[in-house]
Structures are given as C-alpha cells and as structure tokens.
A protein has these predicted regions:
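Amphipathic alpha-helical interaction elements
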Residues: 2-3, 77, 116, 120, ...
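RNase H-like nuclease fold core
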Residues: 4-104, 109, 113, 117-121, ...
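Solvent-exposed alpha-helical segments within well-ordered globular domains of core cellular machineries
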Residues: 9-16, 20, 83-90, 94, ...
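Conserved phosphate-chemistry cores used by DNA topoisomerases
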Residues: 16, 32, 70, 83-90, ...
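A polyampholytic, Gly/Pro-enriched intrinsically disordered region
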Residues: 33, 141-158
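Inter-helix linker motif
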Residues: 120-136
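Generic structural signal for alpha-helix starts
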Residues: 139-140, 198
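Acidic/histidine-rich catalytic cores and adjacent linkers
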Residues: 152-281
Length: 281
C-alpha cells in the first residue's frame, strides 16, 4: 500500500477500517425506485493458486426517480456467465434495488438472460461499443463512411424512424459487407432500446459513457498495484474509490431531469428473489 515505516499492526488496522467502511457502503440499503441501471466491467489481474488470472470487476451505477445517481454495487468474478450476473443482480435486489426499467451495458455473455430473469427490465446495448463492433466488419479505409451512415439512425426523433433508417442503411451496407448486415439484424432492437424512454434522458442512457470517468480513476489506481494478491484486496481498493466518488456525486446537482421521470410507468413492488447471494467482499 506504499506505507513504508509503518508497523504491520497499524497497516492491519488501517486495512480493517477501510474494509469496514467499504463493506458498509457496498451493502447499504437502497430505498425508492431506480429506473436506470448502468453496468460496466474493468478487467484486473489477480493471483490465484499460484497463477495470475484475469477477473472482471463489475461496477453498477443507478439513477433514482429524484434524478440522482449513485454507485449501487461492485461484484468481482472470473466469469461472465448468466449465474455470475444473476448473483450480482439478486444481491442488489436484496438490498432494495427495484423499479429498474432499463439496464445499460456492453454485450456481456449471459447478462441479457439474467436481466430478463431477475430484473424484468429492457436492455440497452452500449451504443459506443456497438459502433466499434460494427466497424470491425469494415476495412479501415471505409470505416468513416460506414460510421456516418450508421449514425443517421441515432439522430432520429423516435424509435420507428430510427429503426427504419437503420434497416435502410443495413440493406445498403450488406451488399459490400454481409457480416455487418447480419450484425445489425441481430442487434438492432438492443441498440435502439433507449428510444422507448423520455427524450430528455436519452443522451445519458444510450451508452455506458456516464461511467467512463469513474472507470478511468479505478483503472489508474489499480495500475499502481498491478497484480492483486486476492479478491479482498480488489474490493478494498476499488470499493474505496467508489465510496469517494459516490460522496462527491451527492454534492452535485441532479444528474437527470426529474420532470421526465413522471413519463415512466410506476413499478409494482418487486418481490425479493429467493436464494440470494451477497456481493463479493
């Protein structure tokens, strides 16, 4: 931890104090309704059984009906299967996360099924990552042209117009790049899901960009460590960063317009899922 000249007992006490604060933060009750939930992954190196493995640190941020955003969860794991995501979503539901209408994330394997099973919300595939994935099917020399064509769908005022535009663009591009056309066919509904929500909110719910600054700070702190000795050390460091960021957010103005929240259909009280697992700590 860079604490040279300090006794082991003092370091242990400092670590315990941090663990207690982080644990209380990550397991705090969540009141009210949270229509929007962003999930994003940062990949870190951890020692495990004499090997160095890559683990996913999933950060969850949600916006409530008062227009404020909070960091609502952290989950660490070596896998991104449906059970991994379901465990995380259930742990947040146990703490009171309810009323979720839209989950925004990259296309992680197993997540979509877990959202449908645990949360029952719509899913918005991160538009930024979607565009990168789409352009991977296009030669570099022609990516600017393809990008400009695809973006025409995203400036439309509503979902029917956006869908019609994207279908038209896909049909034009598939003659040159059939795999791109197939990719658009498969992902159209997911990348346009945010258009079913209030126009005032769309700039913040079409991608995971609202987490970009937070993830950069997490990565900056993690790079100092390099390889973490165990999962607990990851939770300690990242949890402390998240706690600090969340405190700063609470001093800021509302993140989203509250007037538009009234356009969202109120949710019935969500039943707490059974067989709930807690957040990794």
């Amino acid at each position: 931890m860079g604490l040279s000249g300090i006794s082991k007992s003092t370091v242990s006490k400092l670590c315990k104090d941090i663990d207690d604060r982080v644990g209380a933060f990550l397991d705090r009750p969540l009141g009210g309704e949270w229509p929007y939930l962003w999930l994003d992954a940062t990949y870190l190196k951890q020692r495990e059984g004499g090997r160095i493995v890559s683990v996913a640190a999933i950060i969850a941020v949600a916006a409530n009906t008062e227009g404020k955003r909070e960091i609502v969860g952290l989950h660490i794991g070596p896998s991104e299967a449906e059970t991994f995501w379901a465990t995380f979503l259930k742990s947040m539901a146990r703490r009171g996360l309810r009323g979720v209408k839209l989950v925004i994330s990259d296309a992680h394997e197993g997540l979509k099924a877990a959202i449908r099973r645990v949360v029952g919300a719509s899913w918005q595939r991160c538009r930024v990552h979607w565009m990168r994935n789409a352009l991977a099917y296009v030669p570099k020399a022609q990516q600017s042209m393809a990008s400009a064509a695809l973006r025409q769908a995203f400036i439309q005022p509503d979902r029917p117009s956006a869908s019609q535009t994207l279908r038209h663009v896909a049909d034009q591009l598939r003659t040159k790049w059939p795999k791109l056309g197939a990719f658009i066919d498969d992902s159209e509904a997911d990348v346009l899901a945010h258009l079913d929500f209030p126009a005032q909110h769309r700039s913040k719910i079409h991608s995971t960009n609202p987490l970009e600054r937070l993830n950069k700070e997490v990565k900056r702190r993690a790079d100092v460590v390099g390889i973490f000795p165990n999962e607990g050390s990851i939770v300690r460091l990242i949890g402390a960063v998240l706690l600090e960021a969340n405190d700063e957010w609470q001093l800021q103005h509302r993140y989203m317009q509250t007037e538009a929240m009234a356009e969202l259909t109120p949710s019935p009280i969500d039943p707490v899922p059974t067989q709930i697992s807690t957040v990794a700590a």
